[in-house]
Amino acid sequence: MEVEILETCKKELRTFPEEILEDFLDAVAKLKDGISLSMPLSRKMPSIGPLVAELRFRDRAGIYRVIYFIKKRDAIYMVHAFSKKTQKTPKKNLDLASKRIRRL
């Protein structure tokens, strides 16, 4: 499966620690190989859309998320990457991911 990382998402990923980026690249490789990911690495996000999920990473410094969208079962788009301090995903991050998905 093809994986596309939006330019805005690439910029956001550059703020992640190196260890988290390595974990992210491992997860992307699995998705490319067609491996279905589940908790705790990936969680569906029906509040944004039926084919939307997030990659979940954590280290001592914080919590990191990358929201992605599966389009027509032949491409995956990484649309938004961010760190957060609380368990709940901030509404502004959900809204931004939703906006980027609508543009695809």
Where are these regions (language model features)?
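Conserved Hanks-type protein kinase catalytic core
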Residues: 69
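Compact, Lys/Arg-rich rRNA/RNP-binding cores from ribosome-related proteins
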Residues: 82
